[in-house]
């Protein structure tokens, strides 16, 4: 059988590309090295619950056209991701915002929070992730919410990691724990695997 396109990888990108090709009359072969489709967005149903096997994925965009497009393939239930971090027996709001700074220092205004961070900010040569983090948010935030998490994630001390890993660290001087700033945020009610299947119109993956 002849195909116009061979798509390697049945994640969101590959599935959307496939759907667009098929919509324009092309024949597409989709292959994936894993024994399932969906890439890292793959969901499997366990006791009626759609489990995100590779960690939670929240779809988010400010583009109405994109939002309307994905909702053709499943209803994306609105969901606001507001994670919490546990450190030293206390919980802290993420991403770093005024709730976080109030929990850390008892401050209630952006001016107070900025003043503390400015005093603690590292101003030397940036040599590694530790320096970069301290330059961005100061010592307290680094020691409480970045150091141990980063070491666990990378299995290395932050001073042994390159600075570029944490160059874009979101810091908000407002009471807003919404992880994303996009207008549209949600999770497909039937899981991402259902979305991928709907996009590529197959019942079983080709391996």
Regions found by a protein language model. Give the residues of each.
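A conserved short coil-to-beta-strand element within the FAD-binding core of flavoproteins
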Residues: 207
